[in-house]
């Protein structure tokens, strides 16, 4: 059964570890992540961007697939199904479809409008026993076509949004989506520390977990990050394993072209990446 992410992230904050949000793109992604979470006895958050939701035919299809897998793969660890970087309209659709958690990305609105829309969603999520993530300061890189520069959020704006009744907060601290450029300045721990001091027990979220050095992630977790998002790294490992299979000509041996065989190395590569991240975040055996 799907659960909201609130409880698992409160536990993570208190226990000084982070729960991974791993974005799903199809059946292979979802199955690989769920099986690894079960194997590692770790709570997990399945992230769905609006683009990925559309690709998988729609949010109801995603909910049906995930619920079916939870039952038939006998998954017993806590699993949240979370809309990643949702528009206001996308959030409402996910509430209706049966997601257990949503992120409202109002970072491109003026702060007053971001506050007003966040307040409405706080009320809706409370009625549906769902968790709500909000964002302050745009995260850099590209997320479904939206490009941000990796700015640092204003800690006072973070407090204003945190006080609205959301469950966890994503704040820009110099992090970006996708591959990090060679001239990246690193995470601003000063900003993170200031946000943590103003928001107290609020679990904080680190977007763009791919490419951030392990030591920086560990410091961020010590400073209050309880949820770390990973997407690009799983995509890269899946692509590399699939390329290796095809370049070795394995798709031309016997029935190697069968999609179940063709996609198997990529699925195994996702499992290995997810396990490595769960160990880094400290969530193994925390289910």
Predicted regions and their residues:
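Alpha/beta enzyme core
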Residues: 3-11, 15, 27-52, 59-76, ...
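Glycine-rich nucleotide/cofactor/substrate-binding loop typically near the N-terminus or early
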Residues: 81-83, 240, 249
